[in-house]
């Protein structure tokens, strides 16, 4: 690549790999095991360390820190990594930390995501594609976030929680439980408020199926009998609804967290 794309104050360690048309602004620091793929742009004062790869067309804004060691006491300098996909926008003061031995040794971020100012993505998180994290969203370790999920500003997610596809979490929500796909949650303590119907409509989901799925989750979380029985009954009743099937599959998976439920 042309040296004219690298500011004279940037510090790039020997061994770092830069693709075509990479742009590195003033006072950036790039470690020796970092890979920046084609068309990556670092605005200024960006620090990227560790075994870290940034996918093509990703833009990172000032004072972001990517690939630093995880914030856990038992970290023993294991060679864990951070992998970030393509076409991501990573705004000012975002932190994405490397994986750990207890979580597969990797933190992974997909493609086409927007992380607004001050977002923190903890060790061993697995983030999908097309997600939006508003300002100062904080994810603890080992969290999975499905495609198209939206998390409102200043929300915090407890370690090991799962955030389902197409779900939406309102701002200022502490989330200590799994959020089902398409779920809409918010509160001082995150509770299920229904489905993310507006977001589902924008993504082209069938309106009739979406409304039917809303009725289905009300039966699951508020109906008669025990929870497992209700899941089975709803699965049989709505077996032609692909949205309900996706939610049922999520509910039937093993998890170390409870589910966000309707407020009593």
From Swiss-Prot:
Main location: cytoplasm
GO biological process: lipid A biosynthetic process
A Gene Ontology term for the protein's cellular component: cytoplasm
Gene: lpxA
Reaction(s) catalysed (UniProt annotation): a (3R)-hydroxyacyl-[ACP] + UDP-N-acetyl-alpha-D-glucosamine = a UDP-3-O-[(3R)-3-hydroxyacyl]-N-acetyl-alpha-D-glucosamine + holo-[ACP]
E.C. no: 2.3.1.129
Function, as annotated: Involved in the biosynthesis of lipid A, a phosphorylated glycolipid that anchors the lipopolysaccharide to the outer membrane of the cell.
Pfam families xref list: Acetyltransf_11 (PF13720), Hexapep (PF00132)
Database matches in NCBIfam families: lipid_A_lpxA, PRK05289.1
Descriptive protein name: Acyl-[acyl-carrier-protein]--UDP-N-acetylglucosamine O-acyltransferase
Keyword terms: Acyltransferase, Cytoplasm, Lipid A biosynthesis, Lipid biosynthesis, Lipid metabolism, Repeat, Transferase
Recorded family membership: Belongs to the transferase hexapeptide repeat family. LpxA subfamily.
Pathway: Glycolipid biosynthesis; lipid IV(A) biosynthesis; lipid IV(A) from (3R)-3-hydroxytetradecanoyl-[acyl-carrier-protein] and UDP-N-acetyl-alpha-D-glucosamine: step 1/6
PROSITE patterns referenced in this protein's UniProt entry, alphabetically: HEXAPEP_TRANSFERASES
């Amino acid at each position: 690549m042309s040296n004219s794309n690298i500011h004279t104050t940037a510090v790039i360690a020997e061994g770092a790999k830069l693709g075509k048309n990479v742009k590195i602004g003033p006072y950036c620091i790039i470690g020796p095991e970092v890979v920046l793929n084609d068309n990556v742009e670092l605005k200024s004062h960006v620090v990227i360390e560790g075994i870290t790869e940034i996918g093509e067309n990703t833009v990172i804004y000032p004072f972001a820190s990517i690939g630093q060691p995880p914030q856990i006491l038992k970290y023993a300098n294991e060679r864990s990594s951070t992998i970030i996909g393509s076409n991501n926008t990573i705004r000012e003061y975002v932190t994405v930390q490397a994986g750990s031995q207890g979580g597969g040794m990797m933190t992974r971020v997909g493609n086409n995501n927007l992380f607004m100012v001050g977002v923190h993505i903890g060790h061993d998180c697995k983030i999908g594609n097309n997600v939006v994290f508003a300002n100062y969203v904080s994810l603890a370790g080992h969290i999975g976030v499905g495609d198209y999920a939206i998390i409102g500003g200043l929300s915090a997610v407890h370690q090991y929680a799962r955030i389902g596809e197409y779900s939406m979490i309102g701002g200022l929500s502490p989330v200590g439980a799994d959020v089902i796909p398409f779920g809409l949650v918010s509160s001082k303590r995150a509770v299920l408020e229904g489905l993310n119907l507006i977001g589902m409509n924008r993504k082209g989901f069938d309106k009739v199926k979406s409304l039917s799925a809303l009725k289905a989750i009300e039966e699951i979380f508020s109906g008669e009998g025990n929870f497992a029985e209700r899941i089975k009954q709803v699965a049989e009743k709505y077996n032609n609804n692909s949205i309900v099937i996706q939610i049922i599959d999520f509910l039937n998976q093993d998890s170390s967290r409870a589910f966000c439920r309707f407020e009593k």
